[in-house]
Amino acid sequence: MTPRRQQRPKGQLAKAKQAKQPLARSRRPRRRRRAAITQNNLMMLSEPGLSFLKCAFASPDSNTDPGKGIPDNFEGKVLSQKNVYTETGVNFSGATTQNVDTYIIVLPTPGVAFWRCIKTATAPAQPAALTTTDVFTAVPFPDFTSLFGTTATNRADQVAAFRYASMNFGLYPTCNSTQYNGGISVWKGAVQMSTTQYPLDTTPESSQLVHAITGLESALKVGDENYSESFIDGVFTQSINGNAEFPFYPILEGVQTLPGQNVTVAQAGMPFSLDAGAATVAGFTGIGGMDAIFIKVTAAAGSVNTATIKTWACIEYRPNTNTALYKYAHDSPAEDIIALQQYRKVYKSLPVAVRAKLNANMWERVKRLLKAGLVAASYVPGPVGGIATGVQHIGDLIAELSF
């Protein structure tokens, strides 16, 4: 016989229910306290912080506002800019009998949109790999001379230092989908400036200060972490600051080529050279703390590969006090820890590159990452969790500032 389950007497059951009620009530004040977190605490993700994120990640198709600057612990006058370069009808194809490889490097060089080198070979041969004899030429932003002048020795007359928030590059095909033939590969790599005192074989003996860029060897081979697609898919990619801080870097003067005169590419330890061209058009103004973006576009003989190139950079300068630009400078925004944390989160979350058509939704993707990050932060104990709790208000703030 199956034993009967013992049942609690009705009186005891009622007492048990009554005993649970105070526990349920005790949770309510905590919920009320969470809901009552003031808007001031939530504003730790500030409007300048959101403007900084928008400048760094949003396409200038919608907004070219450079924001208020980078909201870190720097205190001083800054000049924020969002430089934009657009080139339409770019032909990546060669003659009907030529295979063409176009190399583009987006470097953190103020005033320069990107550096380009084109290599060709008569079909069926493929273009040779990059060597020390190859030269990358500068493609400047339209306002280069207004900020850096027309002589190499006066580059720092207006601004003394700079730092980047982001660099962005987009290639948008405009050719017929039945006529193209080729592909696009994108990868990234660390680059840095090196400066050495190089001895010269002269009488009497002398030396020369030589600038060079280390890390350009990454351009010689497609990196393991890469984006590779058909040319017709295009590409959008960006680089942001992965360093712990946002240091300023000096504007260089008197540099038009890397390496400089009297020093060979091999002696400087570079895989190829950079040439900014005429000083009245462009120049080499320095290297910031961002990873370089390497792009290789291939086109087969007889193909019709045309596209629009659009690149932009969110950058901050320290203007000289004796210039007219100084009156347009503003105080660097107060530190916004939440905005900087979300900037790092986006840095870790975004892929090397995406298809060009996905660029239109870039800011929407960033907003989703922001909301997800703030939701996760609301479960963190301490001040960060307290600030992030009530994420619905942050979402409303983001929505108000969205495009």
UniProtKB/Swiss-Prot annotation:
Site (Cleavage): 359-360
Keywords: Aspartyl protease, Calcium, Capsid protein, Disulfide bond, Hydrolase, Metal-binding, Protease, T=3 icosahedral capsid protein, Viral penetration into host cytoplasm, Viral penetration via permeabilization of host membrane, Virion, Virus entry into host cell
InterPro entries reported in the protein's UniProt record: Peptidase_A6 (IPR000696), Viral_coat (IPR029053)
Class of enzymatic activity (EC top level): hydrolase
Catalytic site: 61
Gene3D superfamilies: 2.60.120.20
Chain sites annotated for binding Ca(2+) 2: 157, 217, 269
Listed EC numbers: 3.4.23.44
Positions of Ca(2+) 3 binding: 157, 217
The family this protein is said to belong to: Belongs to the peptidase A6 family.
Name of the protein: Capsid protein alpha
Native organism: Boolarra virus
